[in-house]
Amino acid sequence: MLFRSEDEVEAIHLASLKVLQDHGIDFLEPDARALFPKDGVKITDARVRFDPEFVTETIKTAPSEFTLHARNPEHSLRIGGNWMAFGSVASPPNFVELDGTRHAGTRQNFQDLLKLTQMFNIIHFVAGYPVEPVDLHSSIRHLETTYDMLTMTDKALHCYSLGRQRNQDVLELTRIARQVSNEQIDNEPSVFTIINSSSPLRLDIPMLQGIMEFSKRGQLVIITPFTLAGAMAPVTLAGALSLQNAEALSGIVFSQLVRPGAPVAYGGFTSNVDMQSGAPAFGTPEYMRTAMAGGQLARRYGVPYRSSNVCAANALDAQAAYESVFSLWGAIQGGVNFLMHGAGWMEGGLHASLPKLDRKSTRLNSSHANISYAVFCLKK
C-alpha cells in the first residue's frame, strides 16, 4: 500500500541523509569505528558523520531476499520480497495465566509458551524469550533458554545481543543443533538478532558487537530504532520517521562494512507517547501510519522490513483488540516481511498473555488467509 507519496518518501530519505551528514551517529565501540574507511565518513571522538554518497553506495550490497534456516528445513523461512513471517511474543518480564493471575516470568512459563509457539503453525519463528525467565541467573540465562528453544522447537530463533561472548555461545549452540560445520552456518543464516539504537543518534557497545559478530558470520541482523515521537524523537511523524530512517541506515551501512552481502533488515518501531505521562503508546493511528511508511522506506532501499504487533492495553479487552488490529494491519499494509510479537504481547510489553497468544494466533490465521486470497486474485 502506498501511504506516503514518492515525493514524501524521498523527502524523508534526504532529511535522513542530512542528519547523518550534519549530525552523525555515536558509535560507542572503538572496534566498530576502526572498521570505517578514511573516505566517506568523518569521525570525531565517538561521532561518525556519513557522506550521502557513501551511504547510498554501501547499502547496495545488502540482499533483498534470503533464507533463514531452521533446525527443521520445513520451517526455514524466505525473508524479503512478498514473503511474510509471523513471530511469537518476546521479552516481557511478567506472565498472565489463563485465570488472570499476573506474576514474574519463570522458566516453566517460558517453556509453556515455547510449546505453544511450536504448536501453532501460523507462528513461524521464535521471536525471543516469550517471557523473561527471571528465575534463571542472568549469567547462564542465554545458555539455558537457547537450549530450550533448540530442543522444544524446530523453528528459526532469535539471539539477544548482550555481548560478544553470548552471541558466540548462541551461534555455537545453533550450529550444534543443526549439525552443520562452521563454514556452512557462516553461509546459511540460522539465527537473527534485533539491534535497537539508543535514540537519538547512538549505537551502544552491545548492539555494535552484535552487528559485528552476526554480520561477519553471515547471520541476520535487524536494525530497529526505537523512536517515540515527543520523547526521544521529533513530535511530528515526518520528523520521527526521518530520525528512525537515519539510525536504521547507519546500522545497515555498518553491517555491510563488516561483511558486504550480509543479511540485514530494516526495522520500524516508531510510535507516539502519552503526553501527560510520557508512557509509550502502541496500536495508535500514529503507530499504524509509521508502520506503513516504514515499509515504503525499506522497499526504497531494497531490504526486508520488520514491524511488530503491539498494544498498550492492560487487560484482554476491547482496547487490546483495537490496538492489536491497528498494529497488525499497519504492518501488513506496510508490506511487513518479519512480524515480531505476533501473538501474546500486552501492556506495552510488560507482560505476556497466555489467553491473548491463543486468540491472536487465530487472528493471524485469518489475516494470512485474507492476504493469500488477495495475492491469488491479483495473480489471476
List the predicted regions and their residue ranges.
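Catalytic alpha/beta active-site cores
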Residues: 49-234, 238
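Glycine-rich phosphate/pyrophosphate-binding loops
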Residues: 225, 256-268, 304-309, 334-347
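C-terminal catalytic subdomain
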Residues: 305, 315-363
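Single conserved hydrophobic/aromatic residue that forms the stacking wall/gate
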Residues: 2, 364-380
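Catalytic-core signal marking the mid-to-C-terminal active-site face
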Residues: 3-15, 23, 28-35, 45, ...
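Acidic, His- and aromatic-enriched active-site or binding-groove loops in soluble protein domains
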Residues: 147-156, 242-250, 290, 329
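Phosphate/pyrophosphate-binding betaalpha-module
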Residues: 210, 248-304
